[in-house]
């Protein structure tokens, strides 16, 4: 647990350092670039957690995880984006916070698998 917290702290401080140039974006496009970087980091963590968890699951668990993930993606897209006649819009703050929450959910399920055994019923 101490190693995990240290790794989390190092990642957070490294991430904060990398994003320090984004603290005061000069214009909206710089701000969008910075928000996208944060989203990409969250999405990478989500995908890493998904793969780690899937590797621990039996066939039924993998199917439940896949179904749950596809449902989550659909909900995220519906909540954080919209399309109208003038274009397609994504609320990156919504997408990022939703992705971080899902990554944490997957990490929690992975920890359960490694400590007390995988519970497929908790994957939904």
Regions found by a protein language model. Give the residues of each.
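Positively charged n-region of N-terminal signal peptides that target proteins for export
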Residues: 1-4
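Short, linear, compositionally biased motifs with a strong N-terminal bias
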Residues: 10-11, 83
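N-terminal signal peptide c-region/cleavage motif recognized by signal peptidases
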Residues: 11-17
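N-terminal alpha-helical modules
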Residues: 17-124
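Sec-dependent N-terminal signal peptides
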Residues: 6-8
